[in-house]
A protein has these predicted regions:
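A short, GP-enriched loop/loop-strand-helix hinge that lies immediately N-terminal to
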Residues: 1-27, 39-49
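Pre-DFG segment of protein kinase catalytic domains
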Residues: 197-199
């Protein structure tokens, strides 16, 4: 979507995401590399070319549980959680099966509440009317595939944490070059490190989050 919007905006000389913004927003490794360059807090990550490299990263990070995913897909396609004794060949091949560019990303798994955000940006100023607590209950039947089965809005996070999330979202959007437009944020709250950006898209969410839940909870049809 961002690439299409970028091309249309360029053709008609409209306001829209640049080609570089679209590239960062749709390639998860390039996105996270950009975030590191701009001091945006993210879980540790790296590209893997084999199941052996999954083991190598887990040793370096000193963790048992990690997330593997294609760098170029959305909608949780190819995303799987890897536990300590799981079959690494299966996990790697599962992610690769969904990849269009054959690039596979590994991330440390952060245990903590996850937050979905919807943000409008105008002249570099971000307003985040949508902050929802993600729900993953009753999804063990799908494990190790990660399936979100709902969300609560308004969020139950504290006012201080809400402010921290809003600041993080604005800084992350700025890092991706979004000056005017919208962004969708995936945030995890780490007990030791605070809110971290899992991913950010230069579009709004699919489903009914931005379309229904945010307007209904705020009483504002934005």
């Amino acid at each position: 979507i961002p690439q299409i919007v970028s091309q249309i905006a360029t053709f008609f000389n409209w306001i829209g995401p640049s080609a570089k913004t679209s590239e960062w927003a749709t390639h998860k490794f390039k996105m996270k590399t950009r975030f590191i360059e701009k001091n945006i807090a993210v879980p540790r990550f790296g590209l893997v070319k084999s199941s052996r490299e999954i083991s190598d990263f887990r040793k370096v990070w000193d963790v048992d549980t990690v997330i593997i995913k294609p760098t170029d897909r959305s909608g949780s396609r190819g995303v799987i959680r890897i536990y300590k004794n799981d079959d690494l060949d299966y996990a790697f091949n599962y992610a690769k099966k969904y990849s269009l560019n054959n690039e596979i990303l590994l991330e440390e798994f952060i245990s903590g509440p996850q937050i979905s955000t919807e943000t409008i940006i105008y002249n570099g100023v971000a307003i985040t009317p949508g902050i929802a607590d993600r729900v993953y209950g009753d999804t063990t039947a799908f494990s190790p595939i990660i399936i979100e089965n709902g969300g609560w809005i308004p969020s139950q996070v504290s006012p201080k944490l809400r402010q921290d999330i809003c600041v993080l979202i604005e800084e992350a959007a700025r890092a991706l070059g979004v000056e005017n437009g919208v962004v969708k944020g995936d945030i995890v709250i780490c007990a030791a490190r605070g809110p971290l950006v899992i991913e950010m898209a230069a579009r709004l969410s699919g489903g009914d989050f931005s379309q229904s839940l945010v307007p209904l909870s705020l009483g504002i049809n934005y």
